[in-house]
Amino acid sequence: MDKETLDLTLEALRDFTSARLPEKKILELDATDEFPIDIVRDMNGPELGIQLLFIPEEFEGMGGGAFDVYRVCEELARVDLGVATGVLATFLGSDPIIFGGTYEQKKKWMTRIGQEGLLMAYGATEPEAGSDLGALRTTASPEVKDGEVVGYRITGNKQWISNGGYADLYCVLAKAPAGPTWFIVEKDADGLSHGKPEDKHGIRASNTATVSLENVYVDVDRMVGGKEGQGLFQAQLVFGYTRLMVAAFGLGAGWAALDRAIPYSTGRIQGGAPLSEKQGYTHKLIIPHAVRLEAGRAYIEETAERIDSEEGTLNTEGAIAKYLSTEAGNGAADASIQALGGYGYTREYFVEKIKRDARITTIYEGTSEIMEMTICRDRWQLHLKTKGSYYHEMAQQIEELQRQNGNVGAHVVGHCLHGLAELLEMARVNRMTRHQHILFRLGELIAFAEGAASLAKRAARAAKGELNEKAQRRFSPEALAAISRIYARDTAMKIVSEGARWMGGLLPESDGGNLGARLRLPEIFRTQEGLIQDMDYVADVLYERDTA
C-alpha cells in the first residue's frame, strides 16, 4: 500500500468515526455495555471497507503491510478501544488462514471476508489454556470414510473470545490426533453456541463471550493448511504481527488520554497560573508519559519496517513493542486521570474510560508478564550464543550513531547497553536466572534498553529527513532528539537502580564492590545533566509555546 492510499484510508476512517462514533455515542455504548454491531459491520461495508486493509491484493484486498496496520490500529484506538477490538478480532481471526492456509483456502475465505464484510473470531483461548496454548482441551476427532479422513468433529469450550457472539466465521484451535490444528467454522454450524457477553471492566463496546462447540462437524477442507499438527507453528508465525497491532492500541489510547489532559491544564488555574506552566504538573503527569509513548512508537515503526521487509516473524520484537507501548499507554491513561483531578474520575470527562479500556492492552494477546518472559528467554539465548557480546556489539553500533549525531543521546544508550550486557553476564556466572523474578526483571530492562536504542535511531533518521514516508510526524527532529535524550537517561538510571537492586543482593561479596563500575554508574550519573532543561523544552513543544 502506498502512502497516498494509507492517507486516504486514515482520512476516511476519521470521517466515518466522527460521524458514527461521536463522544456522546461512545459514552452511551460504554454505559450500556453495548456492542455496536451495525457500526462495526458498516466499517466492513462499501463506505469504509476497513477489513480490506489486511487482505492481500491477489484476493481483492488492499494488501496493507505491518506499517499500514499499525497506523490504522492507532487511529482506531484513539476513538474507542472497544470498537477497535471488534475490528482487531477480524484481523486476528484471519491470520491463521493468511499465514498458514493453502492457496485455495486463502482465495476462498479472504475473498469472502473482503467482498461480504464477514466478521471473524479467533478461537484459541480456553478456561485452562490462556498463554499456554499447548494445554488446550478442545478436540478434533477425524471422521473417516472409505479409509480417508473426510472431516472432523470438534468439541470443547473457548473463553474470552472477541466477537464471540457475533462472528460469521471462527478460526478454532483444536487438538487433532497429530496435534493442535486450526479449523474454519461458520456461525450456523450445528453444535456451535455462545454465552452471554462478559461484563467487563473496560472495552465495553466490544463483544467478549464464551464459545462452545459440541460435536461440531467441519469438512476436511476447513482444516487450515491441509495438515494436522501445524496450529502452534502457525500461531507463532503471526505473534510479531498481531502484537504490533495491540502495541498500536496502547499507543493510540495513551495519546488519546494525554491529548485531553494537555488542553485541560492550559485552562485550569491554580495559584494564579495555569497548571500547564507548573513543572510539578507537566514534568510528572505529562512529559514522562509522552516520552515513553514515543519510545514505544519508535520500536513499533522499526519492527513494522522489518516485518514488511520480510526479515522473519520477529516474535520477540513484537513482544518488546507490545510491552513498551501498552505499559506506556496504560500509564499515560492513569496519569491523565490524575491530571484532571476530580474531573478525571468522572465518566463525563472520558479519561477514566480510556484508562479502563487501556488496561486490557497489557493483558490480551499475551500479558505483560508473558512478554517479559518471552523477551528475556530469547535475548538470554542470544547472550549465551554470542558469549556475552550481543549487547556490547549493539552498544558499539549505537556509539557509531553518536559519532554521526551527538544530539540524540546515543552515548547514553551505549552506556545502557554495555551495562545490560554486564548484568546478563553476572546473571549467567552466578546462575541468577533460576529466580523467575530476576528473569522477568531482566526482560523489562532489555525492553527499555532496546526501546532507547530504537528511539535514538528514529531521532537520528528524523534529523536527516529519512523517516519512513508513512511515519507519524507529530514532533520535529529537534523535539524528537530531546525526547530521545530524556528516555535514554531514564533507561540508564533504570538499569543502574534495578540492576543494583536485584543483582547486588545476590552477588558474592567479592564481586559486589565493582558492581557500580561494571554498570557504568559514574558515567550514567554524569549524563543526567540537562535533563530538566530537556523536559522544559518538550513541555514547550507539547503546549505549543515558543521554543526559540
Model-flagged regions — what are they?
Residues K25-A31, S265-A273, L293-L324, I337-L340, ...:
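C-terminal helix-coil-helix/basic helical segment that borders enzyme active sites and/or dimer interfaces
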Residues E4, L8-T9, R78, H194-E294, ...:
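Glycine-rich beta->alpha junctions and the first turn(s) of the following alpha-helix
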Residues V72, Y343-G409, M503-A548:
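Glycine-rich phosphate/cofactor-binding loops in nucleotide/flavin-utilizing enzymes
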Residues M1-V87, K107-K108, R112-Q115, G147-E148, ...:
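Amphipathic, small/basic residue-rich leader segments at the start of a protein or domain
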Residues V150-H194:
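A short core secondary-structure module
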Residues E116-A124:
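A short, Trp-centered hydrophobic/proline-enriched beta-strand micro-motif
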Residues P46-K107, T111-G117, N163-L169, L293, ...:
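Internal helix-loop-helix
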Residues G409-A548:
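C-terminal amphipathic alpha-helical interaction region
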